[in-house]
């Protein structure tokens, strides 16, 4: 099959939600319906079934949250679907942002009892900023939940886009009878069961079929009135408006009971976009170009703790990847020929022979690749839009056993390169390493991973710093003068970019006034010292 045909088959999306909305459950059920797993949580492997929950890191298993990001690929209806699972805790917006730069659509999961929650709003803001098309799944209809019209109004208020229901619930909780497919004009009858795949589902055709009110009484009377209101007042689905981020199709169901999953999977194939062009500083890169390009959007350490490995997650931007092909790392100009390239189903890996635009490949990485690196067949390209945000929280870190100092530095270097934490090395001699984060849980995760993956018992200590700004200047002497005068507040991150550590907003304002030739940046792009606007 040629490159344009393969590109047209691809669908790459992420699931976004607030913790406990059912994201992990829906992830497993999508894999189940696509045939990638036999039962929820078990991979269909050649020799044996293996656990394949997307929550695979040890701390995730203990706490029931997604901290790392997993990649899963499945085939369904002659389409190749790449699912990127995002961190599900409110502290992990930066890592989640990096994942959302690698997808072409998002599936938003909402708990029907709680509505649109804070974490979902933050993720929606990222999607809206990128005009990412969003499909909405309102989950847990088998429980007592809020009125569906109220939920739609709330979604529209937070999203700033029209909702277009593709299905509508008949009843809720113990009275949940099923969902009415508005576009196909039929009702799918609800039956509980965690292993059912829909082959034996019962349908009743027609909103005016007397069988539905006979069986579902008052629940259907309310639902039918709401459906008529939707048909009269709601906007018709417009795929162009959806692709532009102006409409979201809405589905209702119960992921734990495999109900409504089929419709969502079909919508991903029928409505979600194939890979589109990606913008580099030099030019626009189209997915069907003959030559390969790809971007490292994540580096994950210790996916296999037994081997202390690091894997670079690369989204293919164009062309065809072949195992063993000669590639150039645009940042360094160095060549590499990756042979042990893998695809993923959560922690399980398989050797990969080829990949196309929007596929995610894993390249074993021993420090050669960094976040934001661009791989090409020789062209020098710099893709945009993969930033580090200035940390909002800081802690100093020391090792309890001085003999483990080297292991501490190795661990923090690897965790910093994968983006799990930001690590700053003070310019002043003898200063403790500083960790910067956007959420408190990141410190707990790093301490846990240092202990379990690197054998380092680290001590976290409060820091006086409240933020940081990366510093640059067109005048090297002006920059050096500023750094010398503020040596106690200067540190370097994992790519040796200089940063000014701040104790208060007033300190930053004074520095900006005294040193007008120095630029203070609230973000920097991965893979190089390309900085955003002053903030």
From Swiss-Prot:
- Mind telling me which Pfam families this protein's record contains? EF-G_D2, GTP_EFTU, RF3_C
Kindly list the GO molecular function terms attached to this UniProt entry. GTP binding; GTPase activity; translation release factor activity, codon nonspecific; translation release factor activity, codon specific
Which processes are annotated in GO (biological process)? regulation of translational termination
Which ranges carry the tr-type G domain? 8-278
Give Gene Ontology CC terms: cytosol
Q: Which UniProt keywords apply?
A: Cytoplasm, GTP-binding, Nucleotide-binding, Protein biosynthesis
The leader peptide range reads: none
Report which superkingdom the organism of origin falls in: Bacteria
The record's subcellular location field reads: Cytoplasm
The record's annotation in SUPFAM superfamilies points to: EF-G C-terminal domain-like, P-loop containing nucleoside triphosphate hydrolases, Translation proteins
Is Protein biosynthesis one of the keywords? Answer: yes
Mainly resides where? cytoplasm
* Protein's job: Increases the formation of ribosomal termination complexes and stimulates activities of RF-1 and RF-2. It binds guanine nucleotides and has strong preference for UGA stop codons. It may interact directly with the ribosome. The stimulation of RF-1 and RF-2 is significantly reduced by GTP and GDP, but not by GMP.
Regarding protein family, the annotation reads: Belongs to the TRAFAC class translation factor GTPase superfamily. Classic translation factor GTPase family. PrfC subfamily.
Q: What is this protein called?
A: Peptide chain release factor 3
Give the organism, scientific name: Bordetella parapertussis (strain 12822 / ATCC BAA-587 / NCTC 13253)
